[in-house]
Each structure stands twice: as structure tokens, then as C-alpha cells.
Amino acid sequence: DETHEAELTALNDLRDGLDTISVERKGDEILKLFAAPSLEYSICLMEKAKINSKIFNTCNHASLSSLIKLEKRLDIAPCAIRRLAAYTGDNLKSQLRFSKKQAKAHQILRQEATNRKDAAELSYRYNKNLALDAILVRSSLQNIEPSKNIFSQIKKGSVAKFPIKPFDLAEYFSGPRLGETLAYLEQKWIESDFTLNKEMLLATIK
């Protein structure tokens, strides 16, 4: 209709002027866009106007669409970095001058989307918000349903405290071997659903 034609015309003008806009300004506008409730409609228009190809090297509209549906169904507020992780694997720091923190979060979400850590482990290793985002991005990229107990698992991981400290192992190991054993025991504890206590864990290496 006429409204869509006018929007496309405006977007075509924007595309032609992108080369004169600073990278930082592009990054700011992309963050605002990806946090907006009407993102999917805007992305469709941008793709029609071929704007996306001037900003991103890779993009996955199907994954983004899947993520937005998940957000609505689970009543989760939009998050620009989460949505960008579902949409593109590009290096956002070099391409759009995102901050180190933003680019790192995006990188972690992309990495964890292909790993097998569950929600509890992600929450333990990072934090509750990043764990939720990682599970949602993984679900959207792999087209799978998140587990029904995702929120309780995230809560469990966020309060879990690993019972072993380096000095607990100093009697048996030193140097790199100590670090390796500590990491081994930590993973064993995580795989027990955080149930093994200090004595049980130490018994496995004596």
C-alpha cells in the first residue's frame, strides 16, 4: 500500500546515505532498532531496501523470527544483544564499534548456542540474564524448544557454590596440575546437578 511504499522510499534514501554515517552512529541506531517491539517489521523493510547487506555480512531472519515468538510466548522483554545474537554472527565490535561488554556478550551467546551446557550450568558460569539469553538464542538458531523448567534451572545455577577451593587440593597437586584437577572436579560437581559435597569430590581423586 501507499504507506509501505513511502517507508520503502525513505529506507532507500537511508541506504544511499549510509556511507556518510559514522560507524558509531550506525551501532547506536542498530541497538535501538533491535530493542524495539516492532523489530521484525522493520527488518523486513530493511531487507527489501537492501540496507541489511550494507550493515551485516551474515544474517538469519528465520532465527530472529523464532526468537521473537519465544519472547512473546514466555513474556520476556526484548533485548538488543540477544536478538542480534540470533540474527548475525558478525564481529559487532569491529563492524559497528559496539562496546567490549556488548561485543563480548554477543560472542558468548553465539558460542553457547552451539554448546551443550544446560540452563543451570550457564547461570552458574555467567549470570541469570545471560543464561536465559543463551538458551533462547540456542533454541531459535537450532529450532528447538527450551526445557519447561528453564527458569527453575537458571535460579538453581545462580545460587550454586562450588565447595572446593584451591587450598583443598594443595596437599595433592601444584602448578598446572592443580588447576586442571580443580576444573575436573568442578565439572564433575556440575554434572551431579550441584549435589556432590566436598568430601565426595575429594574422594574421587584420592
Identify the residue ranges that each predicted region occupies.
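Short, well-structured alpha-helical segments
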Residues: 5-8, 43, 60, 107, ...
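Conserved, hydrophobic alpha-helical core segments of structured domains
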Residues: 12-146
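Non-catalytic interface/linker regions that flank or bridge core catalytic/transmembrane domains
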Residues: 1-15
